[in-house]
Amino acid sequence: MASPSSRLLKFITNGSKLHSAKNNNMIKNKNIISPTITKLFSTSKISNEIGNIRNFNNKISTNLINSNINTKPFFEIPKLFEKKYYSYIPPTWEEKDKEKQFNSITSTREEGGDNEESNRMGNGSIKDAIVWVNHLYPIKVSRLDFRSLFFHIPITKKLNSLFPNDVKIISIEKRIKEGGAYIHFQYDSSNPEYKSIEMVMSKLKSIFAQEKKHFHFASRPAKCKLVYGRPFVEDIDYRFPSTTLKITFKGSEMSPDDLFRLMRPYGHIKDIHYSSPIPSKDGPRQATITFKRMEGAIATRNCLHNKYFPEFNTSLYMDYEQLMRINKLKEQFSKHPKIMIPLLGILATLLTLLLFNPLREYFINKKLSSPCYFGEQEEDDWQERSEQKVLQTHFNFPPNSIVMISAPKGSGKSSLIDKVLENRINTLLIDCNQEVNNNDEEFIESFSKDIGFSPSYSLYSSFGSVIDAIIPTGKGAFHSTTNYQMQTILKLLDEVLAKKAKQFPVDPHQPYEYPLIVIDGFFGMIQAMESKEKANIIMDSVIQWAITSTQRGHAHVVFLSSDSFAGDIIKKYLDNRGGGQISTIQLGDVQPSMAINYIKKRIGPNTPITQHDMELVVDNLGGRYYDLNVLSQRMIAGDSVERALSNMISKAVSEIRAEGFGLSKRNDDSKIGGTKLKWSRPQLWETIKKIAENDFVSYDDLLFNVFLGDESSLNNLISSNLLRFQNVDNERKVTAYSPLYCSAFKQMVNDLEFNVGMDVLVQKARIEEELSKLSKVEDELLKIKNLTSKSWFEPLSIKKRRILLEDKLKDHVAKIEHRENILKKHSLFQKFLREEQMIQMELIKKQREQSKFERQQQQLLQQQQLQQQQQQQQQGSI
């Protein structure tokens, strides 16, 4: 086998050829390599070749440094051939193991031997030894510890300066993750100062103590210790230092006293523990030693590993006991979930109380103290309401009742409350948008964001998901309930408001900007929420908190809702709490003069509008802000007032047919699945006819004459945004949801075909009702007949009953006949309409055929004229 020097000369020769060829421009591409070197580096022995050459290079460099010759290494491996992952290069003191097949640094002979002789190697008076120097780098405790990447300052010169000139350094083996380095050196034992290794170490320790050199901003100076054993130099990625050493005895077992005396010089020991009290026959005994500092465990392992002690007839093998890692944590969770899960729950609670709650309280207070700003609003000039001044005055005095602002959609209730909140401190606006808050988690997240509750419970949900992934048995352990989350959020908000209440003026008549909490669209969101159980929990929590806050005088609470029954829901809660006050403000449409001013402002002076057009707008749209805005956009786009109103009314009719009568595919109660109407079509049609005749109809009239006492159907119809309540002269009246819908009702009634068709349904439904009543009367008469069939004389009481039933029978029969006559008239009218439609269709067909015939005649005439012209041209040419 060729020696390293001969292999080196061969490598240098090939490298010089490559270098000369490159200089002569023979190699123009850097990817082209000489065949000899390509063959050499393509073999599987490339790692060993580079390792041997680098080792030889290190020897030469060290000798040059010890000889104080300032020169570069005489050969460098080209970076072109270096691999990303370098091959393992054994330390210099292990080279003689390969050559002599035994360790001359540390003897592992179990026959005994001289300690001094076992810690040195060499021939004659030249001896070798190894020292461990600590505090050179920051100790790496995990793969995520990147501190060592910032400390690549060379330390070779500093270490060389700490060694005497007559002590030669052979190599320096850096151990970055252990924070130190091995230094392999030689000394002359014939020197009187270096007769023994102890004298050498005494001089080195005194030099290190005098110099007190700090490496890489270390808090302590570097120290050196003699290596007695055979160091285990490794580059395993997942093995890191720790404070605990696991010691394996190869041979006899050492007592705790001997272990303590042997290892105490390297650092303070916290505990010594043996694996089992009785020696095991199956394998070697083990001991665990825990040091107070990690430097002590590192020094002990690096100095005493694989050391043979003849007095104890044993060798010590040491390894680090790894710290608790993520996989160990997962194992603990999987094995002991009943202990670890409650423990983590307690830690999470403590973290919440000590860290999260103060942060949340700070952010809520910051959100509450910031003034509200909504930007410029275009409708500020035209929409001036008396309710605005009333609310501003009410909110500047101590709270004593919940405020309910009820108004249909598009009536401007949000813009009204925005004006009240503009530039006002101590204000929170909670927007319960139905499109965002489809379930309880989305609502709680949105609610937390609006009041400034941060960190929110979404962080807990993420943490719980991670735990669920780690622990299969811990499913749902870290997911708090909806009730708990709402109670926690509202309780913390109440604490912030209670602290604010300490700053209130003593005189209750003194104006002050008291805290104001506005909740917009809450009841609509509750109705649209998927889980009704959780929706009820959220509604109960919020309303109970609102009642408590107002009764304590901490804050004004305002609910904005388009639901006509929202006030009744809060009244039920107040009655259950023993009473309370609720101030209800019913907002209607704005005055016609304000509506005209808004239209003029929106369309601008360039779009003319007549007085007749203004009257049409007021009659059909009233003062509904949303509809006025749509009309102004259509007028700006170029539509006339009549055309825009016609399109809007037609669209409203389509919406009523779809939502009210279910005359669309999406509301069709079919097998595919659709929403079933909570009222009957005849009930809605009769209501529409009454409202089209009179804009306002008594609630009781509809309840008893149209819905026949079915209050749930009437209330569902009102909640569907087709109808609405309005108090007129202290009487509850029912009208269309908007003036536009009222115009749509009138158009539907004026549509004869639709009117007759719906009236047919109404008459059939009424006939069925009369028939069911008639059937009951007939059954009763049969029972009376059976009672009197066996006697000659009819009792007076039974006779009166029979006469009453006969009168009812006649009345029902008369009603049925009347409605049947109406149906006959309707059927004749429908037949007439069908005939008219057929006649119109035939006329249209004849007109089309006539126009087609005329077009054909014109084409023939044109062809004849063209032929005549061609003939005349031919004759003229002849």
Curated annotation (Swiss-Prot):
The chain crosses the membrane at residues 339-359. Residues 761-873 form a coiled coil. Keywords: Coiled coil, Membrane, Mitochondrion, Mitochondrion inner membrane, mRNA processing, RNA-binding, Transmembrane, Transmembrane helix. GO terms for molecular function: RNA binding. CDD domains: RRM_Yme2p_like. Residues 1-338 are mitochondrial matrix. GO terms for cellular component: mitochondrial inner membrane. PANTHER family: MITOCHONDRIAL ESCAPE PROTEIN 2. This is Mitochondrial escape protein 2 homolog. The gene is yme2.
